[in-house]
Amino acid sequence: MDVFRTDRIRNVVLLGHSGSGKTSLTEAMAYLSGMTNRLGKVTDGNTVSDFDKEEIKRKCSISTTLVPVVWGKNKINVLDTPGMFDFVGEAQEAASAADAAVIVVSGKAGVQVGTQKAWELCEKYNLPRMIFVTEMDQDDVSYREVVEQLTELYGKRIAPLHMPLRENGKFVGYINIVKNKGRRYIEKDKKEECPIPDYSVEYLEKYRETLMESVAETSEEFMDRYFGGEEFSVAEISAALAMNVGDGTIVPVCMGSPVNLQGVSNLLDDICGYFPDPSTRPCAGINLNTNEIFEANYDFAKPKSATIFKTIVDPFLGKYSMIKVCSGVIKSDDVLYNVDQESEEKLSKLYVLEGSKPIEVPELHAGDIGAIAKLGDARTG
């Protein structure tokens, strides 16, 4: 895998109730990005992120898995977490390393306890977030009802970016609310432009008004234009969304069917376009020459520092320490100081983990997530 600069990295944790579709979404992302050449299924026990024997047996996640996908010029480090409350510590570890979150909601079940716990975790770690509603291919799913449930809980922060198109109850496409255009699926994730049907106009206008209000609030000039009845361009709306999503004042809602690859490329585009890179997140490091704490802030030009957010044990290869680089550029064979143990540790090889598969890399830039094998004294945290 190539090495990516900080501004090209997005660290995203997938959160949500157990069974909402996080692993299926991760699988679809991996497939569409070209990381895998087949689309696995949870029911078949052959997904990238659920590879443990117990996970395959249970048909659900029990630990956090890192799945890095390349989308355009960006690398998205996807952290697929378990939704079962017994494994909440896994979700907390992943949230501590992420810079943003996608809360996955079952379109069939709607907002559940796990949805609200995911939101609370985002609040705890101050994570910008989006919501992705799954199972849109099922006939009895109401996107509108899910949006209403979310709005009732979280108010005007909820802003749908897409809404479904249905014909005879079947999910056939979507409306892009930012661009105000319809899209019809012609084959899996491939689509073509189509007219917006009359029955969609009422809610399209309602959802679009929410977006326009958010855009207007980003500047006095936009507010004047909004009250003057002027339209905003797509570029202006997108720029305002990136600002508002980044500071958490707006939470976009997207939707699709990961098992059919529908809506997933839209989500990947939105992650790259609206979520911040790691440099916007504050963090600290220690300068070994002066013993002073400094603002690392995921700056590649500052001294090397990293934190271990999770430790995993492989029965064949031994222990892996999953790290997030806080500053500088960490390379194979570097010597880093362990603050807790007050000792130096020489790194061996650096890896990125594609599920259960370690891929060796020469270096990791500030903000990136990877793994180090067989560290002696290092511990999680």
Residue spans for each PLM region:
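Structural and coupling elements of P-loop NTPases
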Residues: M1-G381
